[in-house]
Structures are given as C-alpha cells and as structure tokens.
From Swiss-Prot:
Native species: Pseudomonas putida (strain ATCC 47054 / DSM 6125 / CFBP 8728 / NCIMB 11950 / KT2440)
GO terms assigned for molecular function: ATP binding; ATP hydrolysis activity; DNA replication origin binding; lipid binding
Protein's UniProt name: Chromosomal replication initiator protein DnaA
Name of the gene: dnaA
HAMAP family the record matches: DnaA_bact
Biased composition (Low complexity): 139-148
Length: 506
C-alpha cells in the first residue's frame, strides 16, 4: 500500500472533520509503508487511543474505497517513522486488550530508548486499546496543611524550603471533575485532563490547555490536582500562576537562594502553571523555567500548562519553549455552546439550592454567550435579585436583574455589526449582502449572516429580512435551515460559523 493513498484518504477525511479535530488528532500522524502493511505513528498514547476509537474505522473505509476495495492491513504505533529522528517514549507500562480475531499485543514496559510501541490493527475492525493503571505519585511533599477553620474553598499547602524560600500554593477544592460541566466545546480537554489525573506520567506530558478567559481551563487544572491528592494525599502537587513563579524566582535571587528554588520546583510530583503567556519577554524567567521543565520531564514528573492562545502564537516566548510545549498534548477549550451553557446554569443553581426554571436558564444562556465566568456572574445577580425582592426567578425578573447587561449585549451584537463582520470575514462588501446577487460567493455569506442574526439578536424573521435588502421572512427561514444543515455536513461552513460566532460574542 502506498503512502500516497494514505495522504489521499487523509485529505478526504479533512473535508469531513472540523479543522480543530483534524489539526489535533490527524495532522500529527506520520506514516510509512512496510510491504503490504501501512504503519501509522502517533506522537503519544493519548493520540493513539483517540484516533483508534474515533477515526480509525473511517480511515479504513476510505483506504478500502480508494484502494483495491479491500480494507488494508494497518498498524498503529507510538513514535516516529524511521525516516524521522525518533523521540524516546516515556517509561510507561502499556497493556492492550484485543478481540480474539485481532492480533494480540503483549503488555510491556517501554525501555527508555524505545521510540515505538506497536498496536496491531486488523482490517475488519478497529483494535480496542486499554491503558493500564499505575501507582500514584511518590510522596515528596509535606502533608497538606489543614483547611481554614471557616471551611474555606481553597486548600492551603505551605512548604518551607531550607534557605528561607517559602512557597504557598492553593487548590480550589470545589473545582473537581464532578463539578465540571462537559459539552462539545470542552470534551477533548476534559478527556485529556482526566487521563492525566487518573494515569499520570503516561506520556501526555506536558498537557497544554489553551483558550479564551473563563472557559474552564483553570477548573480542569484544579480538578487534576484535586484528583491526584485524593489518590495520594502526600503527593506534592503545586498549582500557581506564572507570575507567582516569576516572583518566587526574584525572591530567591534576592536571598541568594536560587539553588533552593531550583530544588523545590524540581522536586514536585506535578507542577500546574496557569497563564503561561505571562512568561513572554521575561528572558531570565524563561531560562529558569526551561531548565525546570526539562528536569521535570526527565524525572517523569507531570507538567500541566494553560494559556489564552496556542503555544506557537505566544509572542515573546522562546522557540525552544514552544517546541517543548508541543512534546505532549495540546488541546483547545472552546466557548460553550447553548446546550452546555444551559447545563452550567442548571448545575450552578442546583449547587446554590435555588430553583431555576428551564426557560429562565435558556433565556440567560441565549444572551450571555462569551464565557462561563460571565454566565455565572449573571446567574448570581439574578439569584441575589430574587432573594432581595422575595420573588421567584422568572424571565421578567431576569430582564430586571440583567437590564444593563442585556442592553450592552444587544448593543454589541446588532444586525449591522453582524453584516459588517461577515462581510470583512468573506472579503465582500456589505452592499453585496443586501443586493439581489445570487452567486455562491455572495449567497452563502448572506445566509451565514442571516443565521447569525437569528441566533444572536432578538429580531423577528421579518425584521431580519427587511435589514437584508427587504427580503421575505421565508428567505431568512430557509437561510437558517440551510446553514444548520451545512454545519453538520460541511467542515468549512462549520468552522466559519464558529469563528464568526466567537468574534461577535467575545
């Protein structure tokens, strides 16, 4: 089987998948032909497992359809093709359970120099891979200090390092996997975080979560830390903001205690650093973190990082750091879709022991779209207003409680703004959107703009039609239905719509 056939099928799969999914899971794969067998290499176990579960079946179908008509023999492996410089796989025992009709792979512990872990895949169906569990981290830290007497939400952990360097880090005990609301927008990030929490040191190192503010990155990071401590209360799990790392380093330099600083940060079992983008243009901090990062990975200790953008897009960050951040798994956290926003509101109301009617939650979720933090803030205002006024939560009460916020949202997301944003995105004129032109290059953006207007504003279909050159409301309805269909079948439209939605609501 030729590598060219594989590339052809990958391009076909690209058309079927959202760009984020393709770039995260399919693009990193490498391939080489070995006789009649095709060998596909994944950079780590997590990518291998996910590709095997989610995409392998479709890839085999495409290979069969575009080749000889027979599904080919194919092997999934961890590592790099032999024509590339291999990178050593982490020390991790891996076991595979394969159905009787499939080739068996013995559980084994990867030697430090090994670059490949093969998992045989038969032509008939995808192989089922199960990752074995490992013991939790070794105890390397002082036991966690008792929580504040008032039952505070943050767990204080204070460690005194000989040489006068004292570090205190916090894990919010309410940020757990149980309190995290999962949806399409954060499914991949949640799955990756759980794998790290349940099986640390298994190759997803570092785990890099990126996305806008208030989307749940910090929640997931705390959830991992809390789970690790639940498994081993004596584990040294250090969570901190990147600015805290810088401050500790400066203090260590002032106290002439840099060696103690290094010893402390390089002795942790798991280092969780939030907002890594704040290292940008801090050369001394980047230098120290570079060596700390290397020491932790060489020692098999877990590193989890978050940022507001993709690592390679962080300006002022050294290329060697960007490269190392890509050694593990990088996952985006997207703004929550409507259903997830409703679920978040219902869960928060339940935690607060407040009755929130579903239509009220839907009303808030429709209008607060940017991030979870703003969503929770809006709910708190509504609950407070309900308590002070002695009234049940209704849509009328929500309008009163969020009067200024809703007015601001309506002002920010207007049909005029949508038309301008869509025209700029597709590089056409606003007048084209309002014209009678029916060429695809104009008609499709017009339909997208109409669908966005229906979703993001409170205008009726006839009102939207009037603002698009005096069109009938049935034209707007057809446009909305067409775009909803295309979002399911056309990856480009789906990506365009998501990008425009993000631009208009953040």
């Amino acid at each position: 089987m030729s590598v060219e056939l594989w590339q052809q099928c990958v391009e076909l799969l690209r058309d079927e998948l959202p760009a984020q999914q393709f770039n995260t899971w399919i693009r990193p794969l490498q391939v080489e032909a070995e006789g009649d067998e095709l060998r596909v290499y994944a950079p780590n176990r997590f990518v291998l497992d996910w590709v095997n579960e989610k995409y392998l079946g479709r890839l085999l179908e495409l290979l069969g359809e575009n080749g000889s008509g027979i599904a080919p023999a194919l092997s999934l492996l961890i590592g790099s093709r032999r024509s590339s410089a291999p990178r050593a796989a982490p020390n991790a025992p891996v076991s595979a359970a394969v159905a009787a009709s499939l080739a068996q792979t013995q559980a084994h512990k990867t030697a430090p120099a090994a670059a490949v872990e093969p998992v045989a895949v038969a032509a008939a169906e995808p192989v089922l891979v199960e990752t074995s569990s490992r013991d939790s981290f070794d105890a390397m830290a002082e036991p966690a200090a008792a929580p504040p007497s008032g039952g505070g939400r943050a767990e204080q952990r204070t460690v005194q390092v000989e040489g006068a360097l004292k570090h205190t880090s916090y894990l919010n005990r309410t940020f757990t996997f149980d309190t995290f609301v999962e949806g399409k927008s954060n499914q991949l990030a949640r799955a990756a975080a759980w794998q790290v929490a349940d099986n640390p040191k298994h190759g997803y190192n570092p785990l890099f979560l990126y996305g806008g503010v208030g989307l749940g990155k910090t929640h997931l990071m705390h959830a991992v830390g809390n789970h690790l401590l639940k498994k081993n209360p004596n584990a040294k799990v250090v969570y901190l903001h990147s600015e805290r790392f810088v401050a500790d380093m400066v203090k260590a330099l002032q106290l002439n205690a840099i060696n103690e600083f290094k010893r402390f940060y390089r002795s942790v079992d798991a280092l969780l650093i939030d907002d890594i983008q704040f290292f940008a243009r801090k050369e001394r901090s980047q230098e120290e973190f570079f060596h700390t990062f290397n020491a932790l990975l060489e020692g098999g200790q877990q590193v989890i990082l978050t940022s507001d953008r993709y690592p390679k897009e962080i300006e002022g960050l050294e290329e060697r750091l960007k490269s190392r951040f890509g050694w593990g798994l990088t996952v985006a956290v997207e703004p929550p879709e409507l259903e997830t926003r409703v679920a978040i509101l219902m869960k928060k109301a339940d935690q607060a022991k407040v009755e929130l009617p579903h239509d009220a939650a839907f009303f808030i979720a429709q209008r607060i779209r940017s991030n979870v933090r703003e969503l929770e803030g809006a709910l708190k205002r509504v609950i407070a207003h309900s308590h002070f006024m002695g009234r049940d939560i209704t849509i009328e009460l929500i309008r009163e409680s969020l009067k200024d916020l809703l007015a601001l949202q309506d002002k920010l997301v207007s049909v005029d703004n949508i038309q301008r944003t869509v025209a700029e995105y597709y590089k056409i004129k606003i007048s084209d959107l309002l014209s009678k032109r029916r060429s695809r290059s104009v008609a499709r953006p017009r339909q997208v703009a109409m669908a966005l207007s229906k979703e993001l504003t409170n205008h009726s279909l006839p009102e939207i039609g009037d603002m698009f050159g005096g069109r009938d409301h049935t034209t707007v309805l057809h446009a909305c239905r067409k775009i909803n269909e295309l979002k399911e079948s056309d990856a480009d439209i789906r990506e365009d719509y998501k990008n425009l939605l993000r631009t208009l609501t953040t």
